[in-house]
């Protein structure tokens, strides 16, 4: 018998189709290095995703458009942080060149 059982999982999501999609997306996230929300009994990412769904740590976002907006905002923040870091590195290089020319 599968652990967690399909019956307990279907209490957490509206349909078995939603369960499959949520489980697959979470398994891909875990394989891509996303931080886990708990300790697992399972080794496989697909079963780990089901464990997280069963515990209630992973849920379907109630408003898909808000989820997309939050993902876009996170990606934009990461892009801006990367640009700022690159700008600081370029400034540091320019400063070191100036200091080297003064000597």
From Swiss-Prot:
Enumerate the Gene Ontology biological process terms.
Answer: DNA-templated transcription
Q: Which UniProt keywords apply?
A: DNA-directed RNA polymerase, Nucleotidyltransferase, Transcription, Transferase
> Which Gene Ontology cellular component terms are annotated?
DNA-directed RNA polymerase complex
* Cross-referenced SMART domains: RNA_pol_Rpb6 (SM01409)
- The EC number on file is 2.7.7.6
Q: Recall the GO molecular function terms of this protein's record.
A: DNA binding; DNA-directed RNA polymerase activity
InterPro entries named among the record's database cross-references: DNA-dir_RNA_pol_omega (IPR003716), Pol_omega/Rpo6/RPB6 (IPR006110), RPB6/omega-like_sf (IPR036161)
Pfam families for this protein: RNA_pol_Rpb6
Catalytic activity annotated for this protein? RNA(n) + a ribonucleoside 5'-triphosphate = RNA(n+1) + diphosphate
Which of the seven top EC classes does this enzyme belong to?
Answer: transferase
The organism's superkingdom is given as Bacteria
Q: Does the keyword Transferase apply?
A: yes
Summarizing the function annotation, the protein's role is:
Promotes RNA polymerase assembly. Latches the N- and C-terminal regions of the beta' subunit thereby facilitating its interaction with the beta and alpha subunits.
The family database entries (PANTHER family) matched by this protein are listed as: DNA-DIRECTED RNA POLYMERASE SUBUNIT OMEGA
Q: Report the family membership.
A: Belongs to the RNA polymerase subunit omega family.
Q: How does it assemble?
A: The RNAP catalytic core consists of 2 alpha, 1 beta, 1 beta' and 1 omega subunit. When a sigma factor is associated with the core the holoenzyme is formed, which can initiate transcription.
Protein name as catalogued: DNA-directed RNA polymerase subunit omega
What organism does the record attribute this protein to? Streptococcus agalactiae serotype V (strain ATCC BAA-611 / 2603 V/R)
Protein's gene: rpoZ
